[in-house]
Every structure is written in structure tokens, then in C-alpha cells.
Amino acid sequence: MKPIVKYNVEEPYCSNKIAPFNSQNTFLAREVLPYYAVLPHVGRMDDIWGSYILQYYFPNSVIYNKASVYQDRNVQDLVTNLEKEVIGYRNTYNFINNLQKYMDNLPEEAQHFYKTYMKAYE
């Protein structure tokens, strides 16, 4: 049986600290699109690390609110998920504490992708 996880969020909230967000049910302002990407080659950190990069360029800009849709999650292989999250457990602390050098902390394939992505907005 899958757990049903629901939060009772009544009003939007934010923080002046960097905080993760994922790519699901996320609304982005047009001007931030060049800075946010779901990054390949970083396992399950693809959207989370992308959110940290966005906040490097736009600090104090994230607002959380209740979901506007309900997501019926597909069946997951928890061991595979864990294996794909290890990169985050090992590297996220360093990643967010050295955001001015975020490109150096990405795998080479992710660096190439992000540079190509940014060029599309020049």
C-alpha cells in the first residue's frame, strides 16, 4: 500500500535561506527561465540542484504554497531511487556552500548541458 502524504498549507510561505524545490507543480517567472534547468547526469538531484542554481542568481525568491494539483505517484523502486540520490547525500552540502563555483561542482556532462541551455537564451 502506498502512503498518502498531504500537507495542510493554508497560506504561502517563504524563507530568506536557500531551500530546495523540485520541478513538479512549480511555477516560474519568465525572467528566471534561463537560470533554471532540470540537470542531467546528477541522479535524482536533477531538479533540486537546478533550484539551488536559480537561487544563486535570484536569492530570496522562492515562495511555497499548497499544490494546485494532486500527483498520483507511480510505483517506485526504492533501492534504485536511493542509488540515484547518493550523489546528493555526498555532494549537496558542498554544492550549496560553493554556489559561486557551481559549474565546477557539476559532472562534466551536466556542465556541457547547462552551458548549451544558457546559450539558447542569449
Language model segments and positions:
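C-terminal catalytic/acceptor-binding lobe
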Residues: 2-122
